[in-house]
Amino acid sequence: MACLKLQAVTKSYDGVTPVIKQIDLDVTDGEFIVMVGPSGCGKSTLLRMVAGLERTTSGDIYIDNLRVTDMEPKDRGIAMVFQNYALYPHMSVFDNMAYGLKIRGFGKEQIRQRVDEAARILELEPLLKRKPRELSGGQRQRVAMGRAIVREPAVFLFDEPLSNLDAKLRVQMRLELQQLHRRLKTTSLYVTHDQVEAMTLAQRVIVMNKGVAEQIGTPSEVYQRPATLFVASFIGSPAMNLLAGTVSPDGRAFILADGMTLPLEVPRPQWADRRLTLGIRPEHIQQRVSQQKTSAQGVPMTLLTLELLGADNLAHGQWGGQSVIARLSHEEMPTAGSVLYLYLPPAALHFFDSESGLRMES
């Protein structure tokens, strides 16, 4: 096991435009970190730099306090699991897991001990003589993990390892990854575009956007207190409702573009006349039966459509020409065209500066 440190890591392919911008990260011994973000955000590039498959333009990478920035991948003490398994089709499961050890000069008995132990951990013992074509997708991915485990690396690197699996198998493999990490306690850096994977696997999440680490925090911190508008819009399904507007001169209302006002039970006079974006998650909006427009009874919204999800329902509408989604219980089934009265609890409101995108603190 080892710690991992990234110090002002930057990457540019043309020497002008950075695709990774000054990333600083400290991963403690045995920690499981997940990088999440949309396609093209730089998460896989950053992982490849840690692996040594990409060179940094500037900055340094340390593994267990050893500077590895210019080291070859084989000398860094890392093991990588890829999206496409990368198994040798003509080799058995045993030989696939053992191959890396063979070319590094390990003895037969040491190889057998390591492969047998990894197979036991991953429940692959009955499959050691099979070829990859005889395995399911989940079994192939476990073989790929086994090949990484036998190396006994200082750091595990995972590059979207579950992307090729169907939804049901992804759930199963997430659970297996959690159990594997609890057992091995190896420092791990994991890349995914799937926020469910990020939130369920990570001890800390790095939300990436355009080469920048927008926020680094626990899953709870990232979800409950997003640091930027991007994080608020990316994390959560459905995403946080984000409404652009201005705080009234007395700080007691939030005025939307068309003049519609949302009462603020907790006045914000310090932000008077300032252009902000108000955010609230769909599950925090509460439906009221009263038709009064006071904040305690709810603000009216005409229902455009209702999505029935089984466990709950999503009500879609608009305020001030801006989309709003409220998560209702499965028992609440209003019809399209009806008016809902929605209450916004003060403690559930988030405010962001509309220009910088940064979170506003009261």
UniProtKB/Swiss-Prot annotation:
It is found in: Cell inner membrane. It is an enzyme of class 7 (translocase). It is a peripheral membrane protein. The keyword Cell inner membrane applies. ATP binds at residues 37-44. It comes from the Bacteria. The keyword Membrane applies. One of its GO terms (molecular function) is ATP binding. GO terms for cellular component: ATP-binding cassette (ABC) transporter complex, substrate-binding subunit-containing. GO terms for biological process: carbohydrate transport; glycerophosphodiester transmembrane transport. Its EC number is 7.6.2.10. Keywords: ATP-binding, Cell inner membrane, Cell membrane, Membrane, Nucleotide-binding, Sugar transport, Translocase, Transport. It catalyses: sn-glycerol 3-phosphate(out) + ATP + H2O = sn-glycerol 3-phosphate(in) + ADP + phosphate + H(+). SUPFAM superfamilies: MOP-like, P-loop containing nucleoside triphosphate hydrolases. Residues 4-235 form the ABC transporter domain. Part of the ABC transporter complex UgpBAEC involved in sn-glycerol-3-phosphate (G3P) import. Responsible for energy coupling to the transport system. The complex is composed of two ATP-binding proteins (UgpC), two transmembrane proteins (UgpA and UgpE) and a solute-binding protein (UgpB). NCBIfam families: PRK11650.1. Belongs to the ABC transporter superfamily. sn-glycerol-3-phosphate importer (TC 3.A.1.1.3) family. This is sn-glycerol-3-phosphate import ATP-binding protein UgpC. It comes from Yersinia enterocolitica serotype O:8 / biotype 1B (strain NCTC 13174 / 8081).
